[in-house]
């Protein structure tokens, strides 16, 4: 009887710990351009690099390339729409890249926040390879402004168009390293 109780207690602890993964964010990299075009090169880690071409004008666009020193593989995201804010005759475009780690399995991701729903992405990194893990443009009828919120236990994707707000909960499939959005 005691053995059964100990086994049940151990199983309960094991199941509880596998469900209690936390999302941990790193310091975001914020890139901005004012009425024009700019190229940025930044280190994500000592081995990972991000190259960005960001344009602000009548519309904003961004091209991103994730690379590593050790691998020839690269992930390119091209012509991502970026929200342009116009104030005092200036067109400003801003792009935010936020590192994200799942503490249960150590998987690393990068949130790409362009402010425009069609440009929002999550990029995964595992074993020297970058992969697109979430593309908001794949969601049905997604337009307008957008943002991510990272909470301890979940990632939320918010959209706002014509005064209508929508929130999606993003669930990670650890086998495919992709996120599924549920409204």
Q: Which residues does each PLM region occupy?
A:
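N-terminal signal peptide c-region/cleavage motif recognized by signal peptidases
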Residues: 16-18
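Acidic, small-residue rich beta-repeat scaffolds with periodic aromatic anchors
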Residues: 21-46, 54-59, 125-183
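Long, charged/polar, surface-exposed segments that mediate recognition or autoinhibition
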Residues: 96-135
């Amino acid at each position: 009887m005691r053995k059964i109780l100990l086994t049940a207690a151990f199983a309960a602890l094991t199941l509880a710990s596998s469900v209690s993964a936390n999302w941990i964010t790193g310091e975001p990299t914020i890139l901005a351009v004012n009425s024009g075009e700019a190229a940025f090169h930044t280190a994500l880690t000592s081995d990972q690099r991000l190259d960005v071409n960001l344009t602000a004008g009548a519309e904003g666009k961004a091209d991103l390339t994730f690379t590593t020193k050790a691998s020839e593989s690269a992930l390119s995201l091209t012509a991502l729409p970026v929200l342009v804010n116009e104030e005092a005759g200036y067109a400003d475009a801003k792009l935010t890249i936020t590192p994200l780690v799942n503490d249960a399995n150590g998987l690393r991701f990068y949130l790409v926040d362009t402010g425009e729903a069609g440009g929002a992405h999550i990029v995964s990194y595992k074993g020297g390879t970058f992969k697109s893990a979430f593309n908001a443009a794949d969601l049905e009828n997604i337009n307008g402004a957008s943002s991510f919120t990272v909470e301890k236990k979940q990632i939320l994707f918010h959209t706002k168009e014509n005064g209508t707000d929508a929130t999606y909960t993003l669930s990670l499939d650890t086998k495919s390293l992709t996120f599924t959005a549920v409204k």
